[in-house]
């Protein structure tokens, strides 16, 4: 460990050697992605931190990592001995990077360097405004250095390029030409002629195309320019891309030439500053005056979040088939561990993936399995390692958070299960987290209600006993796309986006006790119309997840009748849907679990 700490200390020293007052290293890629290819894992290369969300700032006298509540424990462990300080976000006392930089320097001018390929236009504008307020015009200099770390990172990976998979209307429920026609109509309504798209999930949805350039996410690294006449897809290895009607393929590296050649065709251009990287924006500005660019949230974000009939059918199928694999896994785990078989967290994770991979249409996991026993489950995004993986023992709690990518849908399920004797505290936490999940599941609410307005339903049982969790309660899920998508969310942070029929969102409260245990229950919900009255339209949720809830350690007096009835009814449905999909011994086991 000391040797690894020295590696990261050396890398921080190399970054300081670039000669800037501050260097910002962002945890994203040129497309604003949450998950990205190894080439852009710059924060991990420089610091050793492997969490999905984190930004690094290196000054001549300080190195700091900014990350949120999901990763505090992990960051403390991985940063130990590196000299890098943890800066906590999504807490009341947070000081984000722009404000921290604005208060850190005593002398001017301040030279701040960043990789403009991995900083959004919106982020750079916020940074510019904040530093101007602190140091005044001329008191600072923002320096865009594309691929800033390449001179230091000798074996930096190349940009990947995987085979292209075009999907047809039978799979997606809507043809590519119809999606493009809709987008062009949207642009007209916004006073624009064209749109430049950078977000990989939006491009994948719009073009009905998938790939595997990024682990767990079926994307092709690319840009897309949609004009009134054409859709130009900028992608690597153009010669290997199968033809698709209505799509012109161009090389990923000739974006500047294409913008110049098609300037007149584009007219007024719409871009989303939250995902467009700053360096690409500068290229666009070479050919478009500021008055010829319209900023706004991409209309694709909301449109793809509202699933069509075919997509909803696919999700239902995915959760049933994945549920059968998960039940088979839980049967194997319980019988193996209680039977004295040596099973590690890694082996359990591999077993889950092996069972899921037997499903027709499987394209990979939708994220890295979280296979966590005991105290390891207190890290919400814990990932076990093949070497020295902890042994799962026949006592306490085990947590599995797992999902799959299928051509007909994407899944994400968490189950915490007892493997033997559990403490009173474990049983209380288990029951109260389940109580919160059920209370949100049973919600009926008026149309126009945002996720932040119903988040407290999942937290109320925890708050009542002075418990809480730091992450959001729910995130959107894409259709054979990313397991995390917006615009909706269920979390305490303000998000005005209403929940709408057709949205598919997770419901995953939890409790995490460092050094002891972690509990999370997660089902995925389909928002639907419940009915109408003189007070308007009301909405509710349908549960898509199909995996039983273990009731053996519930403290039933902590649940009311409606909650107990829900558990019984849910488990009955799970058994009915899965019994004929399971091996006889697994079906027999599940029947007992669902009583």
Please place each PLM-identified region on the residue numbering.
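Active-site neighborhoods and metal-handling regions in enzymes and metal-associated proteins
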Residues: 1-595
């Amino acid at each position: 460990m000391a040797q690894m700490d020295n590696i990261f200390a050396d890398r921080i020293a190399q970054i300081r050697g670039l000669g800037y007052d501050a260097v910002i290293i962002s945890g994203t890629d040129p497309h604003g992605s949450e998950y990205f290819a190894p080439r852009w894992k710059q924060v991990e290369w420089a610091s050793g931190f492997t969490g999905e969300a984190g930004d690094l700032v290196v000054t001549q006298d300080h190195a700091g990592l900014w990350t949120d509540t999901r990763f505090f424990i992990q960051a403390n462990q991985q940063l130990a001995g590196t000299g890098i300080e943890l800066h906590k976000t999504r807490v009341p006392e947070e000081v984000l990077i722009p404000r921290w930089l604005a208060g850190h320097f005593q002398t001017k001018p301040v030279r701040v360097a960043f990789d403009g390929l991995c900083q959004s236009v919106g982020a750079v504008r916020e940074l510019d405004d904040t530093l101007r307020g602190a140091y005044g015009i001329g008191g600072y200099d923002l320096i865009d250095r594309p691929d800033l770390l390449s001179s230091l990172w000798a074996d930096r990976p190349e940009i990947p390029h995987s085979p292209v998979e075009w999907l047809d209307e039978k799979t997606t429920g809507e043809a590519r030409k119809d999606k493009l026609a809709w987008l062009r109509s949207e642009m007209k309504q916004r006073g624009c002629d064209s749109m430049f798209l950078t977000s990989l999930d939006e491009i994948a949805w719009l073009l009905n195309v998938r790939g595997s350039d990024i682990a767990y996410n079926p994307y092709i690294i690319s840009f897309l320019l949609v004009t009134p006449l054409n859709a130009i897809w900028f992608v690597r290895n153009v010669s290997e891309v199968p033809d698709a009607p209505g799509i012109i393929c161009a090389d990923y590296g000739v974006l500047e030439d294409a913008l110049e050649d098609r300037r007149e065709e584009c007219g007024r251009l719409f871009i989303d500053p939250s995902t467009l990287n700053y360096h690409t924006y500068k290229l666009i500005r070479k050919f478009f005056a500021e008055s010829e660019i319209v900023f706004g949230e991409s209309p694709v974000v909301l449109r793809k979040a509202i699933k069509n009939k075919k997509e909803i059918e696919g999700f239902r199928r995915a959760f049933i088939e994945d549920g059968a694999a998960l039940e088979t896994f839980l049967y194997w785990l319980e019988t193996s561990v209680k039977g004295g078989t040596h099973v590690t967290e890694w082996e359990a994770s591999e077993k889950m993936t092996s069972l899921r991979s037997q499903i027709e249409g499987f394209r990979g996991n939708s994220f890295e399995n979280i296979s966590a026993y005991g105290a390891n489950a207190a890290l919400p995004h814990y990932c076990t390692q093949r070497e020295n993986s902890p042994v799962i023992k026949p006592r306490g709690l085990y947590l599995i958070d797992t999902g799959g990518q299928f051509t007909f849908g994407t899944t994400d399920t968490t189950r915490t299960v007892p493997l033997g004797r559990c403490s009173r505290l474990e049983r209380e936490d288990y029951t109260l987290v389940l109580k919160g999940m059920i209370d949100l599941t049973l919600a009926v609410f008026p149309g126009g209600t945002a996720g932040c307005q119903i988040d407290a339903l999942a937290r109320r049982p925890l708050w009542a006993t002075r418990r809480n969790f730091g992450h959001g309660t729910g995130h959107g899920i894409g259709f054979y796309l990313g397991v995390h998508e917006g615009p909706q969310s269920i979390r305490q942070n303000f998000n005005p986006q209403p929940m709408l029929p057709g949205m598919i969102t997770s419901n995953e409260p939890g409790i995490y006790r460092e050094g002891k245990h972690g509990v999370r229950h997660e089902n995925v919900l389909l928002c639907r119309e419940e009915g109408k009255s003189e007070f308007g339209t009301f909405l509710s949720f349908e549960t898509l997840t199909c995996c039983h809830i273990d009731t053996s350690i519930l403290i039933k007096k902590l649940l009311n009748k409606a909650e107990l009835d829900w558990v019984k009814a849910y488990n009955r449905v799970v058994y009915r849907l899965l019994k004929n999909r399971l091996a006889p011994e697994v079906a027999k086991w599940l029947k007992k679990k669902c009583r």
